C-alpha cells in the first residue's frame, strides 16, 4: 500500500470526527497540537533515516498520524502516550503501546521488554516538556539511540543548534552537542497543526555519537560546570564558577586556553569547555 493511502490520521476531518466520538478536545495542559499535514509527516520520515526493521520510540503519539507513517515504513514502534483518550484508537495500529507519563517512564525497561540494539526516537514532542524529555533520553540510556528526530518549539530548536557567541547558546546546547551531532532540519508553520499553536515549530535531527567525550563517571561533574557557567550568563565565567572552583584556578585555566580573565560563558565551544573542565579537574 502506498504511503499516501495511510495518511488518514493526518486528516483534520478524521481527527475532529474522532474527538466528537469520544467527546474529547485537545488538552492545552498536555501541549496537544496535532499534526495535520501529510507533507510534513513525509519530511519528518525522510529526515529521521528510519528504515524497515528499525525499532522506534515515539513520545506523545496522540491520534497517531506520525505513528501510522512509521508503521507503514516498516518500523517497530514503541509509543508512550499519557492521555488515555487515545488508547483504543492507537491499539488499532500494530505497535507496542504504553499509556504512561513519558517523563516518569524508566527507559531502561525498553531493553527489558526485548528492544535490543540501538533504536531511533521520532516524535512530535509536547512542547512544555521538551527539555526534560531530551535530557532524560541521554541521562538514562545514552547508548540506546542511533538518531533522535523531534519536533519542538522553533525557539528551542534554534537554542540547541546555536553556535558559541550568540545569546541563544547555552548549557542545553552544550549538553546535547556532547552526546550528538545536532542539526536544524526545517521549520514548520502553525497552520500545519490543529489547533494552531501560538509559536512556530521546527524539526531537529540528532545523530548520536558512537563514543562520548568523557567517561560516564565524569558526566555529572562536567554538566554541573556548564550549568553553573550559564546560570549567571551576564557574569564573567570565573565569577559564575566561583562556587565550584577558586577564581584564581579558573583564571589560570583560561590563560592556558588563551582566553582572558574577562571571558563570558557563551564564548567557549563544547571542546573548549571540555579542555577547561580537564584543567580544573587536574588542579582542584
UniProtKB/Swiss-Prot annotation:
GO molecular function: 16S rRNA (adenine(1518)-N(6)/adenine(1519)-N(6))-dimethyltransferase activity; RNA binding
SUPFAM superfamilies linked to this entry: S-adenosyl-L-methionine-dependent methyltransferases
Signal sequence coordinates: none
One GO CC annotation: cytosol
Coiled coil (residue ranges): none
SMART domains to which the protein is assigned, alphabetical: rADc (SM00650)
Compartments (UniProt record): Cytoplasm
A Pfam family assignment: RrnaAD
Binding site for S-adenosyl-L-methionine: 33, 35, 60, 81, 101, 124
Primary location: cytoplasm
Source species, domain of life: Bacteria
Keywords on record: Cytoplasm, Methyltransferase, RNA-binding, rRNA processing, S-adenosyl-L-methionine, Transferase
Primary enzyme class: transferase
EC number(s) on file: 2.1.1.182
Catalytic reactions on record: adenosine(1518)/adenosine(1519) in 16S rRNA + 4 S-adenosyl-L-methionine = N(6)-dimethyladenosine(1518)/N(6)-dimethyladenosine(1519) in 16S rRNA + 4 S-adenosyl-L-homocysteine + 4 H(+)
PROSITE patterns noted in UniProt: RRNA_A_DIMETH, SAM_RNA_A_N6_MT
PANTHER family from the UniProt entry: DIMETHYLADENOSINE TRANSFERASE (PTHR11727), DIMETHYLADENOSINE TRANSFERASE-RELATED (PTHR11727:SF7)
UniProt function note: Specifically dimethylates two adjacent adenosines (A1518 and A1519) in the loop of a conserved hairpin near the 3'-end of 16S rRNA in the 30S particle. May play a critical role in biogenesis of 30S subunits.
Family: Belongs to the class I-like SAM-binding methyltransferase superfamily. rRNA adenine N(6)-methyltransferase family. RsmA subfamily.
Protein name: Ribosomal RNA small subunit methyltransferase A
Biological source species: Chlamydia felis (strain Fe/C-56)
